[in-house]
């Protein structure tokens, strides 16, 4: 919840993604408030620094990506499992209850921009 303290971030989710060295590392997905015109890279760097300052470097939190919106079910539950599978490059069952299927493509593209899925 600490990520929320940044005034530019409207919503966020953190999922554990596969990592060759550590087994799993946290990856943040940030949805910015509308009208934020600061550079995404700057905001990501601030959020990562803020989390590391709060939780400590043991959190291994180094990466976050900005997305338009979080994938949710129609009842509002964040589809973290699906986000993890996209980041890990795994096949995933299409979530029948997803609110807007187009968002999964947006997430795939956003993840590609920071090098996910990692190729073996």
Predicted segments with their positions:
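Short, small-residue-biased leader/transition segments that mark boundaries at the very start
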Residues: 1-4
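Conserved C-terminal "lid"/linker of ANL adenylate-forming enzymes
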Residues: 13-20, 24-29, 44, 48-120
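Short beta-strand-to-loop capping motifs
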Residues: 30-34
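Short, conserved charged micro-motifs
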Residues: 36-46
């Amino acid at each position: 919840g600490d990520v929320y303290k940044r005034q530019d971030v409207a919503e966020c989710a953190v999922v554990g993604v596969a990592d060759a060295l550590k087994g799993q590392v946290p990856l943040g997905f940030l949805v910015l408030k509308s009208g934020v015109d600061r550079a995404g890279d700057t905001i990501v760097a601030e959020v990562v620094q803020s989390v590391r300052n709060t939780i400590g470097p043991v959190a291994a939190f180094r990466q976050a990506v900005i997305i338009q919106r979080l994938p949710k079910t129609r009842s509002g539950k964040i589809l973290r499992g699906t986000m993890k599978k996209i980041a890990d490059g795994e096949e995933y069952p299409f979530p029948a209850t997803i609110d807007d299927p187009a968002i999964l493509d947006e997430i795939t593209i956003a993840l590609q921009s920071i090098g996910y899925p990692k190729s073996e």
